UniProtKB/Swiss-Prot annotation:
The lineage of its organism: Viruses, Monodnaviria, Shotokuvirae, Cossaviricota, Papovaviricetes. Gene3D superfamilies: 3.30.160.330. Plays a role in viral genome replication by driving entry of quiescent cells into the cell cycle. Stimulation of progression from G1 to S phase allows the virus to efficiently use the cellular DNA replicating machinery to achieve viral genome replication. E7 protein has both transforming and trans-activating activities. Induces the disassembly of the E2F1 transcription factor from RB1, with subsequent transcriptional activation of E2F1-regulated S-phase genes. Interferes with host histone deacetylation mediated by HDAC1 and HDAC2, leading to transcription activation. This is Protein E7. Its main location: host cell. It comes from Human papillomavirus 20. Homodimer. Homooligomer. Interacts with host RB1; this interaction induces dissociation of RB1-E2F1 complex thereby disrupting RB1 activity. Interacts with host EP300; this interaction represses EP300 transcriptional activity. Interacts with protein E2; this interaction inhibits E7 oncogenic activity. Interacts with host TMEM173/STING; this interaction impairs the ability of TMEM173/STING to sense cytosolic DNA and promote the production of type I interferon (IFN-alpha and IFN-beta). HAMAP family: PPV_E7.
Length: 102
């Protein structure tokens, strides 16, 4: 390289001189992709169970029942939400509350 600025003519890459063993790779190799049935068999089945949840209405405290199907992690998370931050509302009280938090 001559001068302060690099020009394209100054940069010459000769891969054959640096690594003569470099060869192009055939992208259509002998590898086979698994079919859809094999993929389904390998996926673990998510175990869900049915639950009846009884919780008080957030306004009038009447008992509310809902039925859900959830994983063990989901039901524990839902339980924590009901204890800490989430309140269910009965049909009578839902009209008294503003929707969307506003």
């Amino acid at each position: 390289m001559i001068g302060k600025e690099v020009t394209l003519q100054d940069i010459v890459l000769e891969l054959n001189e640096l690594q003569p063993e470099v060869q192009p790779v055939d992208l259509f190799c002998e590898e086979e992709l698994p079919n859809e049935q094999q993929e389904r068999e390998e996926e673990p089945q998510i175990e869900r169970a049915s639950y009846k949840v009884v919780a008080p209405c957030g306004c009038c405290k009447v008992k509310l029942r809902i039925f859900i199907s959830a994983t063990e992690f989901a039901i524990r998370s839902f339980q924590q939400l009901l204890i800490d931050e989430l309140q269910l509302l009965c049909p009578d009280c839902r009209g008294n509350c503003k929707h969307g938090g506003s």
